[in-house]
Amino acid sequence: MEVMLDFLYRNGKDVQKARNEQISTFTNQQHVPITWKQDKSKFEMIEFKGYEAVRKLSKVTGGERLFYDRTKPFTKMIPYYNKFETEKTVTKPFAYIIPQAYREVVDRLIMNKVHVEQLAENSRLMVENYRINSFETSPRAYEGHYLHSNTQVESFVKEVQFRSGDYLVYTDQPAARYVIETLEPEATDSFFNWNFFDGILGQKEYFSDY
């Protein structure tokens, strides 16, 4: 933390300039990357400092535990894989419409300074939709979520009934990158992959008028 604060103190203006340039570039992009893959053919060697790892008996449980022996420091060169290639892109949409049922999603958008509007009246609109064709779910929880991955969708155009108060999120705004990387289902850290839309995955019976 101290190193980061010192760096920002000395380079704050350059960081802000780079960030503003990135926002401007993204605003003008029509095709947006949403997933990446590591290029293992490209790497650089860096110096890594650590301590030898050993197993020792725990005074609490009596079982073995991992222990880093600070009397045995080491330094060695290791490969650092810091090159990634775009794996999948999407065409940036004009906007997203989020039904009111997903207020948790909208709250997180607002907390991240996304400008959100609401429809003033009921509307039937021809819009592009996604159908979830496949996905994988982790068997173990992470941060309280059973994350989805390798999500595959197909798009289709359909007339949809929207209600007054449904949320409208335009992509022509400084937070556009966050908007797209969370609302595109196939994006690595999308709200779909973080389980916020799991309600759509179960088969439901339509209401009975009795």
Residue ranges of each PLM-predicted region?
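Hard-cation-handling environments
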Residues: 1-127, 131
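Catalytic centers of hydrolytic enzymes
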Residues: 108-111, 117-118, 134-210
